[in-house]
């Protein structure tokens, strides 16, 4: 019998959660991560599944995700511990045939449950499936330090925030030309913040929760981690620049346009217009 802990998706989750912990983005039980799988991914590991998978209803049906398996982080679990005990901190779940709930097929031992942000993740998965024709498979939420810091000093406006991040590091416009969506402050772990995040995910692969953290979406764990890492690096540069008295010079609008043309991306118009 093949061991599911050696599968590409469990190993990928171990690496992503460990890297995020080492970055300082996921203190205590902060942050959560979900990866959409296919039946073929989990088929070799049926022998590892729970004999009687627990069923948990969703707070609202999500028929678009019917019969879809995911690997998810657990509620109250520490990213730093995933590498030590994957089965206690991760779980493979599968949405039922009508999208009304899911079974926990593997992991989340000792009656653990998926992340409290699962509604936000699943709603965002639905929107990114539609926005990318199924290409995006990962939703990652973390507490990226410098991005959070900027939400206290920059106007929490998509165009303003996006433009500052683009100017903070040349690669940013290439990596996230669609800009950064921003919510008002909202109570986490609710359907309301999940719906608001998903609405922004229709237009942006990055969504900021002011004074809290960031949501990122991408086709792979590496791409999604790299997306957040790129934005966070720019935020780190900006924090240093603002601490030194602000910008004396920066990347101009004309240079941003040239950058987009060189790499074949279309920058968010509202950010470019500032």
From Swiss-Prot:
It catalyses: L-rhamnulose 1-phosphate = (S)-lactaldehyde + dihydroxyacetone phosphate. Pathway: Carbohydrate degradation; L-rhamnose degradation; glycerone phosphate from L-rhamnose: step 3/3. It is found in: Cytoplasm. Binds 1 zinc ion per subunit. Its EC number is 4.1.2.19. SMART domains: Aldolase_II. One of its GO terms (cellular component) is cytosol. One of its GO terms (molecular function) is metal ion binding. InterPro entries: Aldolase_class_II_sugar_metab (IPR050197), Aldolase_II/adducin_N (IPR001303), Aldolase_II/adducin_N_sf (IPR036409), Rhamnulose-1-P_Aldolase (IPR013447). It holds the Pfam family Aldolase_II. Its cofactor is Zn(2+). Zn(2+) binds at residues 141, 143, 212. Keywords: Cytoplasm, Lyase, Metal-binding, Rhamnose metabolism, Zinc. GO terms for biological process: pentose catabolic process; rhamnose catabolic process. The active site is at 117. It is an enzyme of class 4 (lyase). Homotetramer. Belongs to the aldolase class II family. RhaD subfamily. Catalyzes the reversible cleavage of L-rhamnulose-1-phosphate to dihydroxyacetone phosphate (DHAP) and L-lactaldehyde. This is Rhamnulose-1-phosphate aldolase. It comes from Escherichia coli O127:H6 (strain E2348/69 / EPEC).
